[in-house]
Every structure is written in C-alpha cells, then in structure tokens.
Amino acid sequence: EGINAEALGANRIELCSNLAVGGLSPSFNEVKEALKFLNIPVFVMVRPREWNFIYTKKEKELMIQEIRNLKNIKVEGIVIGSLNKKGEIDTEFMKEVVKIAKPMNITFHKAIDEVKDYNKAIEQLIEIGIDRVLTSGKKDKAEDAIGFLKTINRLYGNDITFVAAGNITKDNLDSLNNKLDFKEYHGKSIVGYLK
C-alpha cells in the first residue's frame, strides 16, 4: 500500500499494523522493507497494544527500545502518544522519548483527543519539543470539529504543526482544506483508495 500511496502522490507514509484498532507498531522487518522501497519519508507508529494510551513501565521500556532501533535504521519520524491515569500527557515519558528519538521527527498521535484539558496538553507538548500533533479535534471526524481545529491552530500553530485526521479521504480533502487551511492532513485514503 505504501508504494501505491507514493505513486498516487502521498508525501509521507505513516507505517503501522492493525489499522482496525487505530494502528499498532509494525514489525521491525516491515519497517526495513518499507525503507527499501519508498522514496518518501516514513513515520513509524510506536504503540505496543490497543485499548488505551496508559502504559506500564515494561511497555515503556519496550517502546524506548523500539525507538532506538528505528533511529538506528534512519527512520524519518515516529508517531507516539502516552497518557497518565488522570487523562493528561505522560510528560516524564514523553520527555524521555524526545531525548532518545531526536533528531527524528516526533508526532503525538490521537491520544491527544482523549486528554481532559486540551490546551494544557498542547502547551506541554510544545514545551517538551514535540513536532506534530495528529488530531481530529476530540471528534471521530475532523469535519465535525472545524471550529475547534481552527481555534487550536490559530492559538498554537506557530509553535507546533497540527495534522488533521479522522475520516479524511480524497473525496473530502479539498472541502476540509478550504475550511481549515492546515498544512498537513492524514488519512488512509487521502490520495485515493489503495486496494
């Protein structure tokens, strides 16, 4: 699918497994294969399991090792997110992620849409040094959160890049872009249907 997406005009690939549950970490071999065949940047999902984004100490250790492995093979970026039991950014873990991962690009994924205080969370991510935030504006579909997405982009868009996500396809991309005017959009069918 990555090769087809590149051929159809994608300018970056987010590589993950098990998209049905929002995406999980792909195997290391899948990442190496993708890097062989793709000429566009590859961002790799670092998420060991589904359910929620509250990770155990052991899971965090595995995620850090995964990030080290990805950095060693020159992956362009990672997509990751971690929350604490209070519904806030797990700032200590995310600081460690930034320390280990840089200079790779770091996208905080849709775990952001589950935080209690969105503005506080964005401010924390900026302070920590996260490059991008993948968000549907706390809704299932980006098109249901136009006002919210425009507001956060106006407030914080100079300090962090917002990537609109949530049922964005080739069919609704132009309409959404006319309303949002974001720099980046994310969707499995954003350049067309790949299968």
Model-derived regions: residue spans:
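Catalytic cores of alpha/beta
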Residues: E1-L8, Y55-N69, D113-I128, K150-A164, ...
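Active-site-adjacent beta->alpha loops and helix N-cap segments on the catalytic face
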Residues: G2-I3, L19-F43, K58-E61, L83-K102, ...
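Glycine-rich phosphate-binding active-site loops on the catalytic face of alpha/beta enzymes
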Residues: L8-G23, N69, I73-K85, I128-E143, ...
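Glycine-/proline-rich flexible loop or hinge segments
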Residues: C16-N18, R49-N52
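Short beta-strand/loop segments at the ligand-binding rim of alpha/beta enzyme cores
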Residues: L38-W51, I100-I112, Y156-A165
